[in-house]
C-alpha cells in the first residue's frame, strides 16, 4: 500500500506562522501587564469609623492620582509620585511597590463620594469606588449642671471676696453708728458731769458752813471763891464762866 505525504498549501503555512508569532508576542506582553485589583463598587462605613481602600498591581507604581467627586464638585486628594507616605485632611495614602492603600481616619460626611483612581505602572489604569458614610454626627452631650473646675474656682473666689467686703461694711457701719451715738451723747454727758460736780461742790460748801443752834449750849460750871471777913475763902455756888456764851 502506497502512502502520500501530507502537504499544506503555502498560504496555510503562512497563516500558522503568523498565529504562532502573535501567541509568542502576547505571552511576552502578558508578563508586563499591571493586572490591577482594586476595591470597587460601594463601601459603606458608619460615621466616625475608619476604612481602607486599596489597589494592587503586578508591577511597581510610578504615579498615583486620586480624585473625589461629591455634590457635583470634583477635587484632587492626592497626585503623588510613588513610593511614599502622604496625609491630608483625614486621608492617608501609602504607596509601596505595587500596593497602594488609602486610609480614612474617622469617616465624616466630607469623606463621602465617588473616588476615582488613576494608576500608572507599566500601563495606565482607572478605577472607581463609592464611599457612603451612614449615621449622623453625634450631638454634644447635654449640660448636666456640673461646672468646669475653672468656673468653680472663680465662683468660690468671688464669693469669698463678697463675704469679706460685706463683713468690712458691717464693721464700718457699726463703728460709724457708735461714733455718731457718742457725738450725740457727749453734750448730755458733759451737762450731767457739770451737774454732778455742782451738786458735790454745794454739798462740801454746806458742810463747811456754820449753822447756830436754836438754843445755846450750856457751859460747864465754875467754882467762885469770895473772901470772908474771917479771913477765909467762902465757897459760893458754882456760876457759869460765860453765862451768855454759845457754841460756835
Curated annotation (Swiss-Prot):
It is found in: Cell membrane; Secreted. Keywords: Cell membrane, Disulfide bond, Glycoprotein, Membrane, Secreted, Signal, Transmembrane, Transmembrane helix. One of its GO terms (molecular function) is receptor ligand activity. One of its GO terms (biological process) is immune response. Residues 29-145 are extracellular. Detected at the highest levels in peripheral blood leukocytes and breast cancer cell lines. Found in leukocytes of the myeloid lineage, with the strongest expression observed in granulocytes and no detectable expression in lymphocytes. Expressed in thymic epithelial cells and fibroblasts. Interacts with CD7. PANTHER family: SECRETED AND TRANSMEMBRANE PROTEIN 1. This is Secreted and transmembrane protein 1. The lineage of its organism: Eukaryota, Metazoa, Chordata, Craniata, Vertebrata. The gene is SECTM1.
